[in-house]
Amino acid sequence: MHTWSGYSAQKNHANALARHAYILSLDADEALSPELTASIRTAEQAGWHGAYGFNRLTNYCGRWVRHGGWYPDVKIRIFPKASARWTGDHVHETLELDPGTRVNHLAGDLLHWSYHSLSDHAERIERYSTLHARKMLAEGKRAGWVKRRLSPLFKFVQGYVFQMGLLDGSAGFHIARYSARAVALKYAKLHQLLAEHKA
């Protein structure tokens, strides 16, 4: 059993155990659509060259979301084992490719089941906002009045209006609302942490 040491380290450990030159990396809540599966088979038959990315389509509380900044959400998930590694912190992980690695785009969607209920979304926001606040504190960031008051409002308008989240119906509204709440919480918690450090 490998000791948990964060998402990036865990994925790099799994990559090191892979027996083949190319890796397809999927999370537990993801699956390949039939179209994407066919695209991958075609690419394999033609011979792998570089890395491969594809659109990720997210299911939010039972509805597929195509707006609000959540789609196409391109992810690079097929890559040469020797030319890629995961980097990042305990909040996010990012795939880093060697310079010059070509990224090809495949047709079809990577299906992603993210939040199964509004309470699930709220619970994760509470948890991740704490991690974000601690990270911002370590980076020396501040949480002034303008940031705490206006950033959540801008986040809502950005997702619901400018990125057309309203076209996803109630799902789009709740995504924009909880995205704004996530911003409000992380700045509120950062403000509290800063106050505690001054005390």
Question: What does each model-identified segment do?
Answer:
Residues 9-16, 21, 33-197:
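Catalytic-site signature of metal-activated, phosphate-bearing donor transferases
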Residues 28:
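Walker B catalytic motif
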Residues 2-7:
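Short, acidic/turn-prone active-site loops that include or flank metal/cofactor-
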